[in-house]
UniProtKB/Swiss-Prot annotation:
Pfam families: Ribosomal_L29 (PF00831). It comes from Synechococcus sp. (strain JA-2-3B'a(2-13)) (Cyanobacteria bacterium Yellowstone B-Prime). InterPro entries: Ribosomal_protein_uL29, Ribosomal_uL29, Ribosomal_uL29_sf. This is Large ribosomal subunit protein uL29. Gene3D superfamilies: 1.10.287.310. The gene is rpmC. Keywords: Ribonucleoprotein, Ribosomal protein.
């Protein structure tokens, strides 16, 4: 499974972005719970979800600060 692209996160509306952040946090919690109980078969999913969450939070922060990236960035 490839790493998610930040362009995908930037294409979301503000409401979709908030919903996606909530969904990824919930999924990350469930993955950590599975890891703690030794039921996690695909441990790489934790890394992918953390990466996606970081991208989503970065985009949210950019929007709050009013910074809109250009195509060169």
């Amino acid at each position: 499974m490839p790493m998610p692209k930040i362009a995908d996160a930037r294409a979301l509306s503000d409401e979709e972005l908030s919903n996606e952040i909530y969904a990824v946090k919930k999924e990350l919690f469930e993955l950590r719970l599975q890891q703690a109980t030794r039921q996690l078969n695909q441990p790489h999913l934790i890394r992918l979800r953390k990466h996606k969450l970081a991208q989503l939070l970065t985009v949210e922060g950019e929007r709050k600060r009013g910074k809109r990236p250009t195509k060169e960035e």
